């Protein structure tokens, strides 16, 4: 998937793209995608929100409160903010004795950071966890972790980037940075191209 994203990233990120000429769906340009976060009602900020069945998107406070995780029934934690600066210092050892599986990724909340390198790994981790509740978090639960949840919904639940954004923002106050939106847009194009390839193969 990452190679497909790299190919799609070479296109003009500000232009809308219609991959399938027989479909009404058009991948929006990055600026139009960004506007989705400012149009219509959105959820108020909270420490944690359930944004999909058994998927909780939250912040540092939620990740550090072991009793709260137990109350939610969390069995898997994806920390999208591993590192020493502007990050959450937990790790697998932090959850010792809680029967929690942990995945940490070192993602910087910078527009230039390549978060797409974690899309497939994070999507697989979330997908395998979904018999039970999973927490995906970063520091604020708005950019890095939100981006990985959006990628999951696109890869595993087959939502378009537009539908994924609309679904999650109605349940949590999120705002991935501009660079992350470019990468989600590239993922959307790659997934649409794969869908078209399979469609033509079956014709």
From Swiss-Prot:
The Tyrosine-protein phosphatase domain, residue ranges: 47-193
Record GO terms (molecular function): MAP kinase phosphatase activity; protein serine/threonine phosphatase activity; protein tyrosine phosphatase activity; protein tyrosine/serine/threonine phosphatase activity
Listed under catalytic activity are: O-phospho-L-tyrosyl-[protein] + H2O = L-tyrosyl-[protein] + phosphate; O-phospho-L-seryl-[protein] + H2O = L-seryl-[protein] + phosphate; O-phospho-L-threonyl-[protein] + H2O = L-threonyl-[protein] + phosphate
Q: Which GO terms describe its biological process?
A: negative regulation of MAPK cascade; protein dephosphorylation
- Give compartment(s): Cytoplasm; Nucleus
EC number, as in UniProt = 3.1.3.16, 3.1.3.48
What are the record keywords, sorted? Cytoplasm, Hydrolase, Nucleus, Protein phosphatase
Quote the SMART domains the UniProt record gives.
DSPc (SM00195), PTPc_motif (SM00404)
Entry protein name: Dual specificity phosphatase 29
Q: Quick one: where is this thing mainly located? A: cytoplasm
Enzyme class (EC, first level): hydrolase
One Gene Ontology term, aspect cellular component: nucleus
The gene behind this protein is dusp29
Its job: Dual specificity phosphatase able to dephosphorylate phosphotyrosine, phosphoserine and phosphothreonine residues within the same substrate, with a preference for phosphotyrosine as a substrate. Involved in the modulation of AMPK and MAPK1/2 signaling pathways.
What organism is recorded for this protein? Oryzias latipes (Japanese rice fish)
């Amino acid at each position: 998937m990452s190679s497909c994203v790299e190919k799609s990233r070479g296109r003009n990120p500000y232009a809308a793209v219609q991959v399938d000429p027989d479909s009404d769906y058009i991948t929006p340009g990055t600026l139009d995608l960004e506007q989705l976060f400012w149009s219509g009602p959105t959820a108020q900020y909270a420490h944690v929100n359930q944004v999909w069945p058994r998927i909780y998107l939250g912040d540092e406070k939620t990740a550090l409160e072991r009793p709260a995780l137990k109350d939610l029934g969390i069995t898997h934690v994806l920390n999208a903010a591993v590192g020493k600066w502007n990050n959450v210092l937990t790790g697998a050892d932090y959850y010792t004795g809680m029967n929690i599986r942990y995945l940490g990724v070192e993602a910087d909340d910078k527009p230039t950071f390549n978060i797409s390198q974690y899309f497939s790994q994070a999507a697989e981790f979330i997908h395998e966890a979904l018999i039970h509740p999973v927490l995906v978090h970063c520091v604020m639960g708005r950019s890095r972790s939100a981006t990985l949840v959006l990628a999951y919904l696109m890869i595993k639940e087959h939502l378009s980037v537009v539908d994924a954004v609309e679904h999650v923002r109605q349940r949590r106050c999120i705002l991935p940075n501009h660079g992350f939106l470019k990468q989600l847009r590239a993922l959307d194009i790659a997934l649409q191209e794969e869908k078209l390839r399979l469609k033509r193969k079956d014709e």
